Amino acid sequence: MNYKILVQYDGTRYEGWQRQERTESTIQGKIEAVLSKMCGEEVQIQGAGRTDAGVHAKGQVANVHLKEQVDPQEVKQYLNRYLPEDIAVSEVTEVPERFHSRLNATGKIYVYRIATGEVKKVFERRYIYDFGEKPDMELMCRAAEILTGTHDFKSFCANRRMKKSTVRTIYSIDLKEKEGEIVITYTGNGFLHHMIRILTGTLLEVGMKKRSLSSVAELLEVRDREKAGFTAPAKGLTLEKVLYSPLQKESETL
């Protein structure tokens, strides 16, 4: 049986989502350990997005194939009973065998938070980048418009040796300012390694007038990571939601 799992987590003390041999401190590893204990055998899950170390999630999606049918509510309760306090399962549903959380995803929504006030947001410090300066929002919005659409984002990819296509589509980059912070919402069909964090660093450089708008357009042509902006800290980034097509959602209802 195939189960879809909706997960949320505080990524502060983890080495990212993906299981690693050198450490047990990954989100995937923690969930697999609990499921394996429940089933009495080794279990592997597939995640929709491989969030980096320190990145958070409110709507990560995973799926797992179990040999025996189990009530989804029981799976959810068991996971929440034994998972660490900074990982929680919001929902477990039974889905068709062919459903794959990553391969069937049509897009993702990420949110990046930036503190711009003089006073630090002490109680939110794990989830927001303390930039401490107020950039020009109009310039940032204009730069965001340039980056929206289908482009080769190689300049915004941390993996310089990546041989696969670096072409991605960003549907929207929405910037909002509220109470001493800037919230940037990125919606796209997929994102490269550190792509959103590099995009954010680049937008901030434009907003601080350290980079021109014309240079942003050039970044899409030169395909050179060294030319793009700095990589914003991981802690400001949260995976908000994984998108699936409406037809897929209907087919998931058994």
Label each region the model flagged.
Residues 1-254:
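Structured-RNA-binding interfaces characteristic of tRNA pseudouridine synthases
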